[in-house]
Amino acid sequence: MKHPFSRLFSFGEKEQEEMEEKQEREEVRHIPVKSIIPNRFQPRTMFDEEKIDELALTIRTHGIIQPIVVRECGNGRFEIIAGERRWRAVQKLGWTEIPAIIKNLNDKETASVALIENLQREELTPIEEAMAYAKLIELHDLTQEALAQRLGKGQSTIANKLRLLKLPQEVQEALLQRAITERHARALIALKDKEKQLKLLQEIIDKQLNVKQTEDRVLKLLEAGERKPKPKRKAFSRDMRIAVNTIRQSLSMVESSGVSVQSEEEEFDDYYQITIRIAKK
């Protein structure tokens, strides 16, 4: 049976067999709950306390069917690789020990297992999911397309999630708190301007705008921006016109003498630029 993370770790057949043999020899140990620390690479930043309470009731009735997975991190401490919700649940029950399997994984492997395990559960918020994709891309030096293939998802799904990370922190926090939906957030991306995004975000929350209303507001803001007249450039002063004409006449005289001259003229809001190129030969 293939290891669920082998596609990301790129295990060969030999390494795969060795890992499976090792897993068969692994024993479940009961380790102190207080000696366990959360996974540093956990993509989930918020836990639903109601669901943890429900899990605690299930564990009290049926026990822990699947041990948590940890790794040793020195001084008698263990870091969770998989199973943080179970660990939190037994804490609520006041248990002193929890069944666990101890694995020898490095940081990269630990992060990958934690990220993929949570992605497979499909309980992450859109922003947590986006951060998990970004971390996997960084850890394994993958393209969006390669990550999509390994996770069995469409490339557009990965790309759309990653775009959420370009939104202001306030919008990302609203997504994290589930104050707005992913479709609300994706509508805000079109505005580009941070001030407008935040203003509309507040309006979405205060007025409880649905997605269609939000998209209509975005469209109106974009149309208003297109209609806004561009500021007029400063008119040429008399002295400036004289200066520009003098330069042009001088260039004509140089060219008439047989020297190759190229010039470019550009007008900016605050100045007029003339670039002159004279060939050395």
Swiss-Prot record:
GO biological process, one term: chromosome segregation
A molecular function (GO) term: DNA binding
Main localization (coarse): cytoplasm
Keywords for the protein's UniProt record, in alphabetical order: Cell cycle, Cell division, Cytoplasm, DNA-binding, Septation
CDD domains assigned to the protein according to its UniProt record, in alphabetical order: SPO0J_N
Location(s), subcellular: Cytoplasm, Nucleoid
SMART domains: ParB (SM00470)
Keyword Protein biosynthesis: no
Annotated Gene Ontology cellular component terms: chromosome; cytoplasm; nucleoid
One Pfam assignment: HTH_ParB
DNA-binding region extent: 145-164
Taxonomic superkingdom: Bacteria
The keyword Transcription regulation is assigned to this record: no
Start and end residues of each stretch annotated as Disordered: 1-24
Annotated family: Belongs to the ParB family.
Job description of the protein: Effects nucleoid occlusion by binding relatively nonspecifically to DNA and preventing the assembly of the division machinery in the vicinity of the nucleoid, especially under conditions that disturb the cell cycle. It helps to coordinate cell division and chromosome segregation by preventing the formation of the Z ring through the nucleoid, which would cause chromosome breakage.
Protein name, entry field: Nucleoid occlusion protein
Species for this entry: Geobacillus kaustophilus (strain HTA426)
Protein's gene: noc
